[in-house]
Every structure is written in C-alpha cells, then in structure tokens.
Amino acid sequence: MNSKHITLRPITRKDYPFIEDIIRKTWKYDALSSNPKDAKHMARLYLRSCLLRATFSCVAAVDGKVLGVILAGSKKSVPKFALRRTLAQLWSIALLFTTKTGRDIGKFFSTFDQTDVELLKNAGNAFDAEICFFAVDESTRGTGIGKMLFAKALDYLEQEGTKTLYLFTDSSCTYQFYEKRGMQRLGEKTVEFSPHTDYRLNMFIYGLELQAAS
C-alpha cells in the first residue's frame, strides 16, 4: 500500500460504521451471540465508551474508507462533546439490552470493565495518559498504518507533557507490537465467557515512560 494514498486525520461521525466493523471483526463479536444485531450493538457501545475518554483521535483512510484508528486520552485535557457522547453511549446500552442475548453480553462487558479496573489498580494507577483504543483493519496489517497512527498519538501526548501512559490489550490482538516499541507488560488476567460458544481472552495492561522512549 502506497503511503501517499493514506490520509491521516481526526475522526468524524461518518467514520463510526467503518470503525465499528473493525471492532466487530477484531474481537469476533459475532461468535458471542446467535443474534447478529448484538455484535453490531456491542461494537457501537465499545466505540462510544472509548470516545468518552478520548482527547485525541486519528484515523487512517484510503479512498474514503477508514482502515485504522487510534484514540488517546490525556489527563491534562478535557474530552470534547462529553454530553453528546454520554447520551450516545446510553443509547447504545439500551439497544444492546433489548434482547436476552444482548443482556448476557452486557454482563460480559461488565466483566471486562472490572478486569480493566483491577489491572490498572495493580499497576499503580499513576499514569498521565491512556491509549483508549487502537486497531487497524486486518487487511492492512503489516503495511505500516499502525506505526503511523501510534506515532501520531505519541506526538500528541508528548506535546501534552505526558510522562507515563498505559493501554489495555489482549491475546486476540498483536500485543507484540507494543513490546517492540518499548512498552512493558504490567499485569495480565484471563477472562472466560460462554453464552453460546467458548470465549477466552488473556487481558493485559502495558505501560510506557515517554522520556525513556524518546
């Protein structure tokens, strides 16, 4: 893929369907429920929860299609559109909970959230910033899009004066990407859930000192 054809820009609402599709495929949400609508609602809810914490966004687009996205949150800035995004998140929760399978999935998400809180607490909880969400379409992995997006986020956080940052990832992702960039694994925990199929993830928290990385 020619890097000249890749556009890096802030996220817009028109990008949401593309990003939700990346989320659904990356975490295999379709395998979690017999109702295909649940996977879409889950992806929508996950994106809205990440947007609530983000103070920076960047998408990589080719011919108008988003193929990668990164969201970062700095404690030194306030997320934009907080009220609108909170309402959007509540609406996404309501849609997910309209079905029994969706309610089961909601419990699953709650387990993820609790695990994140536990991992962050055990890691010391003393960070200036977070990579809220980072993913690329599987068709573009290995093309350098991920490197470009990650570099953009680090540039922003360095401008914010960030000294330490963290992110959550899991065994369904290419977590080795972070280790190659100097991030240290600070904790891990296994989560299992089986509404209709076996689903198991090893969840990780990684940390980075930006001064040491620069």
Regions found by a protein language model. Name each.
Residues 6-21, 74:
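A short beta-loop-alpha structural element at the N-terminal edge
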Residues 27-46, 86-88, 99:
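Conserved GNAT-fold acetyl-CoA-binding loop/helix
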Residues 36-57, 62, 67, 71, ...:
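Active-site rim helix/loop that mediates acceptor-substrate recognition in acyltransferases
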Residues 76-128, 193-197:
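Conserved acyl-donor/pantetheine-binding loop and adjacent beta-alpha core of acyl/acetyltransferases
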Residues 128-129, 157-170:
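Conserved GNAT acetyl-CoA-binding A-motif
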Residues 136, 142-155, 180:
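Conserved acetyl-CoA-binding loop-helix of GNAT-fold acetyltransferases
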Residues 147, 171-188:
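Conserved active-site alpha-helix within GNAT-family acetyltransferase domains
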Residues 166, 184-202:
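Conserved catalytic-core motifs of GNAT/GCN5-like acyltransferases
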